[in-house]
Amino acid sequence: VRGGWVESGPLDDESRIDRAAAGRVVLRLGRMLRPQRRAILRAVFLLIFQTAALLASPLVVRYAVDAGLVGKSGRAINIAAVVYLILAVTSALLGRSVIWAVSRIGEDFLRSLRARVFRHLINLDLGFFEREKTGRLVARMTSDIDALQELVSQGLVMFVQNALIFVGTLVVMSLLSWQLTLCTIIVVPPVIFASLWFRKRSNTAYLEVRDRVGTNLSTLQEGLEGVRVVQAFGREGGFIERFEETNEAQYDANIATVNIATRYFPFVEFIGVVGLAVVVGAGSYFVDRNILEVGTVLAFVLYLNNLFEPIQQLSQLYNTVQSAAAALNKLFGLLDTPNSVPEKPGAIDLPLAGAMMVSGVAFAYGGGPPDTDGVSHPLGPIVLNDVSITVAAGERVALVGPTGAGKSTLAKLMARFYDPIEGDVSFGGVSLRDATRRSLRERIAVVPQEGFLFAGTVRDNIRVGSPEASDADVDAAVDALGLREHFESFPEGLDTEVRERGSRLSAGEKQLVSLARAALADPTVLVLDEATSNLDPGTELEVERALEALTQGRTVIVVAHRLSTAQRCDRVAVVADGQILEIGTHDDLVSRGDAYAALFAAWTRTE
């Protein structure tokens, strides 16, 4: 902590993977691209023809010089000019075709990958999302995909084309003159060594820039989001000082990359000039002795650029390939993450009605598969231990107890957000482990503590409970809960836009939408996870009335924060230290004078 501010640490270096991992990524990528192999082959053939056109151009110049200028033939010069123009046009057209073909292949792959990752993510168990940070998952779909985007849109073409140009140039130069080729190769090793140095230094420097940019943006975002607190406590000066420090660090990191670039590129240009001087000097020697013609020497001069530039391009491309390989490795790791609550092969539908039975259940958080960074999470302390309870069809049972007792965990097990490590949870005699996911979600609905709304209208958010429902069905669900008048008071009624996360509505209004959503789903079992604990005074009464209407005729499990809710239930189960201490009606438990009576007395004093 410096100056009252918590300093952000550097970002993890996630842009490098070892060769073995890179090899596995390439093999898996090849398998994923197999359906597009014909398109890839077409793109490769186009690229080969384009490279051939580029490599043929210096040979045309050689012909123009030897046959036209030296041979004093205007016809030869005209032929060379026409052929050179044809090659230039052909190369441009082929280049456009190559870029289009490769871009289509890449974009099709990325579209498929994004969809595949999202489908996998949206179906993973709740425990996965409690282990993983949302920001890290978003990064998988944004920055990691962006790293791949750069590779498929530019990198692949550059890599293949530069490799072809380098090899093709060496072959053509060797065929033209092995003597000048040997003279040229002398200056190649310094360029290669310089490029290897640049690759290593620039990768480290660019990672540092990325870290500093992230820290600077984090500082900026934190300051803007907390500007009220900053101004309220007069901390503008301290925050400005902190931002200036992170901004200066970003500046230093950028200057370091500039320093590396200014040492590498001028050196390579200098070596290119040395190579040119060597070729011209040796060429004039061979021309004087009639070993070579002037056109051949000039062609060599033109080929020199084709020899050095690919080395530079491939060196700069290394970081792009490395980042893309690391991004693919992380995305593949995400795709390989198993679901801890999978649907069994041969799963069966839950019955339409029946009792909810929890039998000898034990549960602890953690112990799932490694996260997307390969970090394992050992099994945590036991949260529930040997818990058994039966909720009859149509019965309303409240789960009460102190914070951290295991109430919400028990409710989540009843909805099969998790599977117990011991014991079983069943509905109508069918284990939830054996049930199809579709029937599980149709029979059991959960209303959480905070109603989450998606961008769209109120009607759209209610329809999440049953996407196929008509407007009339939505209206009927709203009317069944007595919420018509409240929703009609909105500017556009049920068609009012709620914006992202329902920012236009209060907490209570969001919960009303959640209740209407549950009513539209029409479940047999309703799990209310402290659904009345985070309400504003203006909607509290309406939420309670809507809840009363929603729970009629349904099996209800309520995680009760307010004991007034427990009073309205058929039975109350007191949960403490991961066990059910007592269970019975409200009146019976109060008369016993044990745990529930103490909770109720304490709650009564605070109300």
Where are these regions (language model features)?
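ABC-type nucleotide-binding domain
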Residues: 350-607
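Cytosolic ends of transmembrane helices, especially the final helix of ABC transmembrane type-1 domains
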Residues: 235, 259, 276, 306-336
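Transmembrane helix-loop-helix hairpins at lipid-water interfaces of multipass membrane proteins
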Residues: 40-94, 101, 174-179, 290-294
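Transmembrane helices of ABC transporter permease
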Residues: 39-49, 84, 154-208, 279-292, ...
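An intracellular "coupling" helix at the cytosolic face of ABC transporter transmembrane type-1 domains
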Residues: 31, 35-38, 126-127, 143-152, ...
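Juxtamembrane loop-to-helix connectors within ABC transporter transmembrane domains
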Residues: 16, 24-27, 33-36, 98, ...
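Alpha-helical segments in transporter systems
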Residues: 27-30, 38-59, 63, 80, ...
